[in-house]
Amino acid sequence: MAWELLSVIGIIAFAVSGAIVAMEEEYDILGVYILGIVTAFGGGAIRNLLIGVPVSALWEQGAYFQIALLSITIVFLFPKLLLKHWNKWGNLSDAIGLAAFAIQGALYAVKMGHPLSAVIVAAVLTGSGGGIIRDLLAGRKPLVLKAEIYAVWAALGGLIVGLGWLGNSFGLYVLFFVLVVCRVCSYMFNWKLPNRSFRLDN
């Protein structure tokens, strides 16, 4: 039950973030719903394609889709009311979603007997793939590739799950907590990976 609750928090966070980006880009109501749904479920869809799970399995998550649609509707109807609280709790909710989705993606891949590399990729795509698709559809540079450390924490979760270091559910919850704390610290202290800017002069 607790794991389902964490997934719901993640779905709400991702759906809301997609809807907010769509409204920032002045998309119409259809665009708001599409970007919200893609952000919440896009990473899982790509993961399923790569690890051999039928994409149609996503349609079995009817309750999650309803939650996402309701969240997007609330954002669209009452943006100011929600954003007042979103600025305070949005990053934490997003961190919860990242950790929960990354671990779930890794567990999917392990269950299907995939190698470690596939487990890590599944974790990264499930945790951050939706955000990447959201930014690309909005014509933005993917934030997860240039802002505070984000996808790395999903990869770390996939690595630990793939190596089989967690023997029970308690271990998974410990990993979840660690990933959430790491992500929260990333945006609180502006942790970033090294980067190098290069422009070719004409």
Swiss-Prot record:
Does the keyword section mention Membrane? yes
Q: What is this protein called?
A: UPF0126 membrane protein YvgT
State the UniProt keywords alphabetically. Cell membrane, Membrane, Transmembrane, Transmembrane helix
> GO CC annotations?
plasma membrane
PANTHER family given for it? INNER MEMBRANE PROTEIN (PTHR30506), UPF0126 INNER MEMBRANE PROTEIN YADS-RELATED (PTHR30506:SF3)
The keyword Transmembrane helix is assigned to this record: yes
- The domain of life is Bacteria
Q: Which family does it belong to?
A: Belongs to the UPF0126 family.
The topology of this chain with respect to the membrane is: Multi-pass membrane protein
